Amino acid sequence: MSTTSLLVQSLPVLAQGAVLTVKFAVLSMVFGLLGAVVLAMMGIRQGEPLEGFERIWVNALAWLARAYVSLMRGTPLLVQIFVIYYGLPSLGISLDPTPAGVIALSANVAAYMSESMRGAINGIARGQWLAAYSLGLSWGQTLRYVIGPQALRIAVPSLSNSLIKDTSLVSVITVTELLRSAQEMIAATYQPLPLYLAAAAIYWVLCQILEWVQRWYEKRLSLPARN
């Protein structure tokens, strides 16, 4: 079989894998960003002049957030995927490959994004907090309506490209994303070079598309807020 015929025959299979890759990346980015916001909120109040039980509670949450981030950033993503998919069943928690992969990627993204999110929140002038408090807003309302929208503009997710590439790791738990689709075609045709190159080209195209979307999103966020 010629290389051209092979690629034409393999394209539908690779396209299905590419669609699943994009779904993995989008879901992981959304859930990871939500997790990053939670982790950032757990740590931003540390250092405030609090007293009694509230101080203990805030410090405990901040410590838990730091421990989680250190653990997730200090261990390989592949190991995290294995722990969730192969390790959790020993605790009675069995997950299908797809949700296990999404959870692993999301947990990893949350750890990496939380620090930039926390830095963005802390980068907002303290006077804006005080002004919101003087208007009667609570801490949560101030974060939601005043600080959060501004911090989001600073901490626009910047993991799009790496996340697309990281999705290839879920192939080890039998998720038929792009890399796994290419491997299945290789097993059937015994022609690894053109198929791996085709998969690499598709990864590159996906990264370029997401990079363009990210630049557009950053430009939208940089515009002054309008009602």
Predicted regions and their residues:
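Transmembrane alpha-helices and adjacent helix-loop boundaries
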Residues: 1-227
